[in-house]
Structures are given as structure tokens and as C-alpha cells.
């Protein structure tokens, strides 16, 4: 039979992705590791190694018991074997091309039409149970096989080892099988010198559309002594049950190799299994493009050679690929068991059975029994094995494909191997994510994993997922050996809800960035050794890791949410280290984030840099040690506080800690200063006390700073000249403080000598000059001492103080206290050295002459050194000392006082006094005004007072409630309009409902009444359940407020003795506010609830309404200028309102009652109020501010209603509301001593217009829409709201 020679590619039938996607979503995802290690590996070793399964490799990776049994299945015995031998002529022309089918095969291959599958297929002459052997071992030249499609068996063996085989010159080839009761396997073997694949090649495909008989299994073996290649257009497709054996010196497949391809509708319902065996390839196997899965849970296996290269690997979302590398030394043949001499054994058994035992009990078993025992050969089953040390799997890029099918827990694609090295190139990995989430597992059971490229989600580096649909990367190295290494040589950037899991002995990362939005999990809990990360950037990230080494940890806040931490959620062990910690500055205090640790024995940090509004909570780690630096990353601009929390903290040798009130350091356990230095930063004339929850230890040595000649200090106070005088400044407090000299090996809590040695290592500096002790060796030292203590005479005339040369002088204006519970200094002011004033000691002349230490014999009890001594301050200026005016005068800017009053008034002046003087001191105030021009000061004060006045305003505090109430007023008016359709019903309800069913037919029911009830619309006023989405905004010169939310209710028309409408509602709205300067931001949750009614008396309508509202507001002040930064804070309060309304109106009906005009008048009462402010600030906190107001209003309105059809309507309502009385009380807002009184609002006049309507969508289902605008004609504030909703009648 002729075969097709035209150029064709395979045409696959279309399938319903929606149908099969829904079905496959309920198929449970199974782990294939168990089959890999307990079934597949033994099958390989017991099958290939023994040679018992030659040609049956389809069983080696069958992914189930049946497939494992196939590994050792002997080939099916053919009924008849046809043999063809190439005779003379085929061995004479090496450059000639032949058509293999026409030249040799056609005489023993039949073909015909398969009516069940509507396609032509071919088979060995006589039937699929026969075999064809073609002997061409001496043939030369090139033999083309093209168009042999749907070859369904039996076996075909072509030996042409000196010739070239070209598959698919004009058309592709497909080798497959028929599934019958014999469950036969089709085996096709080609043995050639070279094999070229130029067109599609299919293995175990279904014939035609695939709707008919299923294929069983097919094994295609291609063996070439030199090489096997395919072109880019030659696609090789392996369907369920397909095996491809490749044996050659090298294999290079440039076209796509598709394992687990689908062909027919319904194939999605079950996974597919396919295998490629390259174990007999001596060189490298190269797959340019390998695809596993086709919208199905395909499971594929490659029995690999030593080196396997894959350009692009495409995995379907639920597919799995296993690449099995050979063991060290390759597969070895095993000895075959010798058959037992069963006849002799049986004879011996019979003799023994007929004999009498020692207990005279005879075994009844007659001799020469026909019962035979057949002993089978012993089967040797090997367990899992590691790939040889030189086995490598290289994949340039891995990509997963997905559809929108939703499955609980998502889908997982997997790549598993046992090679010594699994290397993923610079193309990296792309995970296609969809709803319910997707996971990619890359696993090397016995070796290492290296990834050179990035990790992408939906083809984006840093791509994100959605909550509940996370994208997950999983890597497992050395799962069985527990000795694998996972290495990532490219920076990893993970978007929101993208997770990374790594199990290995050692994991190495160049960089990981989860700071793009947070909500990530880095699960390294399966790393048994060390996790090494060069740079880790986090934001609200869950990090599960133990025993790590992080070169740099950067913690962002990103304003994700209040209290969103990066959480190290595993015990970090005792060998964890971070070289540098950087806490980035938060956006504002309510958006603070940070990092916390679950538990751990010890954490070593080399350098620690903290920032405002960020947290570091290590209280659950037993010990933390700082080895080099502990400082603020924003020391020149400390505009917010950090929160740093430790259990036991150690400052290592030569480490430096910068400490101020902005550090906000908590040590709940012990603190050890092991020869480090604490730099105390003076802010506002004070230093912050370092409080230790339990014990503190100060360990020092006799080491000398070669640059200064002083002992290396343990505590330093920088800018000590700015300390407030006549005040004790406590540096450290603890339950117990001990002191120790590590050079001498002594330590004690109360040893006087050790305490005095410690005091010499407590230093006060003015810039770089020490001011508590001066060591004078020459005139330059005299000048330096004068600079330190502020003595200009010593600087200008050092010769007058030459008597100090060779001596150490102690500044007795500074006293130091060190005992078992406190370390402090007391600054009276600098004393002045005199020639006979004492307080000096001679410098030693030995080898330690450079050491600047003061002798204990120095006077320490001078009268002016006592804490009780206070200087006599005298006001030398026009204004009292300590006022903001005095600060301007001392700065020689007296005229700016008048400018301040003229432009900012007394309120601005009082605010400046509070911010600079009352909350700090005159020194701080002087620094602020020196750095700020007068114009800028008044500008900032005016902006602040405007904002504070807005905060105090009850109108501002209840603005969101008013907008929500306005939205509901519009909705309620729409409901009343709808239920007031009293004039258009000209026929009774029964007749009207019957009219609606005209010309309709129904199945026989029990009664006509049942038909009427089930199918006719309800024209009587029914009970209605309604819901609306609402939105609104408030606009004025100071800023704008917006609101969005939902409202729902139920109402009904009562038609008894009294015609009336009654209803109730509830609503929720979230509002936000931003002023124009963006210095005031608010967010509030608001609720509104109430009842409404309308009573009819002929054309008269009486409306009544009562409602209440409550709002919880969270606001923050965010001034950017340094002058106002103390105002920045978060605060909250509650706002509430209650209202009752009553109105009367009269209906005028026109146009056959379709148009109704209704004028109305009404009165209302409103009660508005707010609670006191609660602030998180400890500097200038907002307090008090509660308000209450009662309003009485009168209104006049006119309304037009237009009813059309049986259910739809449109209306417009316009009116004026006039306040005729208001009274109330308010508690002034306070900022320390500064007060802000809420202004009393005048009586207001409001104009309002609203319109809306409703449209029927389906039986008893309606859509409504409305708009409303309210304008205060006095304050020029406008409120706008709209709604979109649904109603259901029943």
C-alpha cells in the first residue's frame, strides 16, 4: 500500500479546556518520589543492568506497579516472523538515496482504513501479532522513511548499521499500538550508522482522532553508531505509554521533544506516562526544547547518560519529569541465577517425608507424589543509587505553563534527578502562576543544584501573586544523601505572596529581595548545615532558617500595615551571624515595621544601623553580640524613634555603640560591655539613660589609644559642653553593675579601685578634645585643653599656663558616679586651672608617660562640685529667660518678634513656645531658629495652626458621618418614591397579574392560583430586600474627604386600615481625608443605622425617620519641616451622631397619574459629637478635644416623580435646609500647655438636589442608581454622594 509523501505536520483535534480543566482539578496531586526510589530505581537496576528487559524500557519509568512490572517483561512472542534481506545492489552506491518503504518494507506491510478512527493505518502483514525483520547490515547509502503514519504493529526490526536512516523527508512517521486483551507492546528498532529526523515523529499515538481504540504501549529504539540528530522543525511526540530508546555516540535533538502529549478529548482525566532512555549514549545528549505535559498531569522519565543538556524545559503545571543518571561506573550486568535441579530435590524431599522422625511420628506423604515444587530464579532488587560523580544535567531555562483551573492547594510541577550536578543556566526559571497558586519543585535526590539565572513569576523578575494564590519555588538538594548543596548565583527578587523553599545541607545565595511588598515566606528550615546569603532585603517576610550567615540584612517597612514584621520563625541556633543589619526608615509611625526572632541561642552582628520607625525584636534570642558598630543610620536627622529590643546584649571588644533617646533600646536581661565604647549623644542638653533589666558588666583593659594617649574609654559623652548644668545625667542603670579589668584578671561589684579605674575610662568630649581631664605635655596641649573647657585665655595665651606642662589637670566642674546600680555624671560647668589651684598630678616619666590618667588623689570635694550648688541665673534681656522671645533676643533677632506676632498672631507664638521651649529647652530653640528664616517660621506656624484648627473642628471630625448620612438619605428617598406608586395602578392586582401571563403556556399544575403565584410579577407592594454600593466626597479649601461603602435594608408596603411604608437599614463606609499640604491624613470606619416610614392619607404624605451613626477615626500628622516635627504623631477618636426627621407633603398627579409633583416641609434635630483624642506621642501629644453640638433645622423641598412601565421610575428632589438653633460644648484640644479652641459655627443654610431611578432587570430583580449634592452656602463646603444598587422583591 502506498504511503503519503506530501509535506504535512500533525493536526491535533481541538479539546474543551474548560471541561477537562474542571475535571482534572479534582484529581489529587501525588508525590512521585516514593515510586522513584522504591519502584523505578530497582526496576532500572534489575532491568537494564541484567539485560532482562531489553527493548522494554517503557516499564522502567512506568510510574506505577504495572509499569514497574513491565520493566522485566519479556517481549511478546509473535505468531509469525517475516524476514526481508537486502540483496545485491544495496551495498554498491553509498551516495544514493532510497525510499525505504517502497524498496523493502512495502511487501510485508499492509494498510487500510480504520472506520472507527476515520484514518489510515499500517501493520505487519498478517496482523499486529506478527513481526517483520529486515536485514540490511551490508546496505549503504541513505534510506528515507516518510509518511508511515499510524503503524500499529507488530514488531519491526530494521538492521542497516552501515547506512543512514532519514525519518520524515516529506511527511512524518508515527509508531503506535492497539490495546486489546493481549495488551501487546509494539517494538520498532532501527539500527543505522546515522539517523536524521526531519519531520514529526509520534510514538504510541491514537489512530486518527483518538476517539476509537486506545493505544497500549510502544517502544521505539533508534541506534546509530555515529549520531542521532533532528532538525528544528522535527517535533518528537511521546504519548501515554510511549518509550524512546536512543543509543549512539551523540544525540542532538533541535526540534521540540514533547513527552506526555495529548490527542483526544478526555485525556485530561488521567496522567500520562512516557520514557526516554539515553543510557546507551556515550557522549552528550542535547535536547534543544523539551516539553512535559499538555494540560495534563504528565509523568515523564529520562534514563540519562553521564551528560544531559536541555535548552528550554517546559513543564505543565501538574507535570513531573524524572532524570535518572547512571551510577558510578555505569550499569553493570548481574549474574543470572542457575536453575535448580528440582527433580532431585523433590526426590530427597519425598524420602525425608516418608521417614520416621525421632518422636516416632510418621509424616503421611506417599512416595512418588505427583506434587512438584517449582523454584524460580532469585530476583535481586537494588535500592536507590546516586548518579556517578561526573553525571551532569544542564538546563538553560525552566518554564512552567498553566491555565486558569482552580484547585484547592494549587498545582505542583516537578523536576527530579539523581545526577551529581543539576545546573540551571542563566535563563533561570519562570513559574506561571494562576488562581489557587502554583508550585515548582526542583529536586536532586543525591547531588547538588546550581541556579545561575533569575526566578520569575509570570515572566517578570519580582513578579507577584495574590493572597490565597501564592507562587512557590521549592528546591531540594541531596534529599537522600543529606549532603547536597543548593547554590543561587543570581539575585532573587520575589514579589508579594511569592515563596521560596530550599532543603539542602548547605544553601548559598547571592541576594534575596522580598522588600517589594512583603507577605513572602523564605523556608530554609530544611537546610541541615549553613545558609549563606550575601544580601537579604525583607519587608513583612517570614524567614524560617537556622544557623545562617547573612552578609547584609536590610529590613524595609514599605508602609504595608501596622506591625508587619519580618519574622525569623525558626530557632536560629547558636551559629548564626549577620555582618551588617540595616533597618530602613519607616514612612510614618503607624506604618512601623521591623524584624523579630522566634528563638535562638546566639546571634552575632558585626554592624547594626537602625532608623526611625523600625523595630528589631531579639528578646527571644538568649544572647546577641555586637562586634563592630551599633549606630543610627540617620544621626544628623533624628526625626523619629526606633525600637530595639534584646534579651542579653554584649558589646564586643573595640565595638562602638552610638546611643541617644532616639535609639529606644530595651535590654530585658544582662548587658556586657566587653571593652567596647558607648558614645552618648547629647540632645537638648541631655543624654538618654541606658536601662538594663538585670545585670550590667563593664570590662576594660589597660590598652592605650595611641592617637590620644588615653586609656580606651568604655563610655564617651560627645558634645558634653551642651549638657544642662546642675543636673545629674544618668548614663546607665541596672539592678547590679560589675566592673572588671581584663588585663589584670580582676572583677568586682563594689571594688573601689576597679570603680576608680572605670571612671578614668568614662570620658567627656568637646568635639575631639577631652574636657574632664587635660594631659599637658606642651603648649599645644594647653590650647587643646582651653578649647575643650571653653577657656579662651588658654587658647590665646598658652604661655600663661606653662605651669601645667608635665601634669594632668582634672576638671572638677565634672563629677562622676559609678556604683553597683548606676553610672552618671554631674556637670556644674568647667572649672579654670590656676597655678596653685591643685587638681593636678605629675605625669609619670616611665614608658607609660603617654597615658593620660588622673591620680585618685585629685580633689573631688570642691564646694562647686556638689550637686546642691546652683548658679544664680539673672535675666539680662527685656523678656524673661526661658521664653521664645528671649531666644530671639540672644540671637540678635529682636525685630523678628514683632514679625512673628504680626504674621502668626499669639496662637502662632504660643505654638512655637510649646514646640521649642516647653518640649525641649532654650538651646534647642536657638538651634532651630538659627537654621530657619523668619519668613519660613511664620509660614510653617500658619500651616500648623490651620491644621490644628481643622483638627479641633467638630465639622471636620464628623464630616465622614455627614457624607454617609447624606448617601443614605438619597437611598431612603429612592425607596419611598418606589413604594409610593399609588396613582398608576388603574386595575387591581389580580387582573394585572393575569394580564402579564397573556398568551403564555404552562405545564399542568394543581391550580390556576399556583400558576399565578409562581410566574406572574407581584404588582402589589411586596417586601423588598435591597443593597447599594455607595460613594461620596466632601470638598473645601482645606482638603477633601472621600467615602465608599455599602448600604442594605428591608422595607414593605402595608395596606391595612392605614396605608404606610415601613423600613430599616444599616450601612458601612470607609472614609479618608487629606489636607492640601498632606500634613493631615485620616482614615475612618463608619457605620449608620436607622428606621424610616411614610404614612398615606389620600394625597397627603407624612414621613418619619430616626437614625444613628458612629465612626472610629485613625489620623496622623506628618509635617516635613524640622521646626514642626515634634507635632508628628498618630491619634484616634470616636465621632457619633443621632438624628430624627419629620416632614409633610402633598401629591399632585398629572399625565394619567404618571407624573407626580410633591411640595413638602419638615423639621429635624441632629446631635453631633466626638470623644477626646488619644495620641501615641510622648513629646507633644494631642489631648482632650471632645465636642458636642445640638442642631435644629427646618426644610422646604419639591419633588418630581415619573413612573413608567409597571415597575420603573425616575425622580428629582430639590430643597433648602435652614438651621434655626444650635448649641453645645467643646473641650479645647491641648498640646502640652498650648490650647486650640474649636470655633463656634454660625447658623448655616444648605441647598440640596438629588435624583435617581430604578430599572427592572429580571423577574423581581431591579437595578437602581442615584446622585445627591449638598452645599453649605455659609461655609462653602460641598458634599457629593452616589449609589448603585439592587433590589429583590418577594
Curated annotation (Swiss-Prot):
UniProt KW keywords: Cell outer membrane, Membrane, Periplasm, Secreted, Signal, Toxin, Transmembrane, Transmembrane beta strand, Virulence
Q: Which Pfam families match?
A: Autotransporter, VacA
List, alphabetically, the InterPro entries matched: Autotransporte_beta, Autotransporte_beta_dom_sf, Vacuolating_cytotoxin
The biased composition feature labelled Basic and acidic residues covers: 330-339
Which Gene Ontology molecular function entries are recorded, alphabetically? toxin activity
State the SMART domains in the record: Autotransporter
Signal sequence, start to end: 1-33
What are the start and end residues of every segment in region (Disordered)?
A: 326-374
Q: Where is the composition biased (Low complexity)?
A: 340-362
Q: Which Gene3D superfamilies match?
A: Autotransporter beta-domain
- Autotransporter domain residues are 1018-1290
Stretches with biased composition (Polar residues): 363-374
What does UniProt say about this protein's domains? The signal peptide, cleaved at the inner membrane, guides the autotransporter protein to the periplasmic space. Then, insertion of the C-terminal translocator domain in the outer membrane forms a hydrophilic pore for the translocation of the passenger domain to the bacterial cell surface, with subsequent cleavage.
Q: What does this protein do?
A: Induces vacuolation of eukaryotic cells. Causes ulceration and gastric lesions.
Identification of the protein by name: Vacuolating cytotoxin autotransporter
Q: What is the lineage of its organism?
A: Bacteria, Pseudomonadati, Campylobacterota, Epsilonproteobacteria, Campylobacterales
Gene this protein is translated from: vacA
